[in-house]
C-alpha cells in the first residue's frame, strides 16, 4: 500500500514507524528487548523506495501499559518503559546513520487518569525524571521530539503529558516539540502555537490530522486549519525548523 501511494504522489516522503511494526520473525521479543535487528528490513526497503525513516516508541497495547507508563510510580513498570524508550532512541540513531540523515523519534505516552486525581503533580514529576534519564544519552544521528495530548479515550480527566508540561520541558531542555493537530480543543487554532513555540524550542514536528470532535484522524484536507498552520511557518521563516 505504501509503495502504491508513493508511486502516485509527487515529491519525496518520509515514513514514520512505530516500534510495534518491527519484523520480529515470530519471536517473542518484549518491548524492553527490541533492537535495530528488527528494523533492518525496513531500513533497506526505505532505501530502495528513496524514502527516509522516522520512528516512535510505543507505550500502548501492552500488558504493562495500564494507564501510566513513564509516569508510573511502580519502579518496575516505569523502568520497563524507560528501557523501551532508550532502546527506541538507539534504533532511531541506527536508522539515521544508515540513511545519512537524522531520524526523528517522537515520544508520546498515553499516561493519564479516567477520573479526577489528586496526584497530578506527582505523576508529572515522575515523567520529567524519566525523560531526563532517557534524553541524557547523546546520539548523533537522531533527534527526539515530545508530543502532548488533551485527553485520550479512557483517560478523559487528566493527561500527564499536557501541552503546558511539554512546552515547558522542551523550552527548558532545548528539545523539539510535536504539534499534533488532533490533540487540542476542537475550537483551538493550533497554528497560533507556532510563532510562540518557535521563540523557545529549536524545531517543530507536525502531525497533521483532521479531528472531528476529538482525535479521530480523518483524512487530512487542505482546509483553513491546515492552510493556516503552514502559513504561520512561512511567515515565521521557519520551514527549515519544521518537519
Predicted regions and their residues:
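Short glycine/threonine-rich loop-to-helix capping motif typified by GTGT followed
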Residues: 27, 118-121, 157-161, 191-192, ...
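Active-site flanking residues adjacent to catalytic metal/cofactor-binding acidic residues
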Residues: 146, 179, 206-208
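Active-site acidic/histidine proton-transfer and metal-coordination neighborhood
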Residues: 32-54, 58, 62-176
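A general structural signal for well-ordered alpha-helical packing
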Residues: 163-166, 190-194, 226-230
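Alpha/beta catalytic barrel-like cores
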Residues: 1-73, 80, 89-90, 101, ...
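Acidic, metal/ion-handling microdomains and their immediate structural contexts
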Residues: 170-173, 186-188, 192
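Short, glycine/acidic-enriched loop or turn micro-motifs at the edges of active sites
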Residues: 183
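Glycine-enriched alpha-helix->loop->beta-strand junction motifs that scaffold or abut catalytic
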Residues: 172-176, 198-204
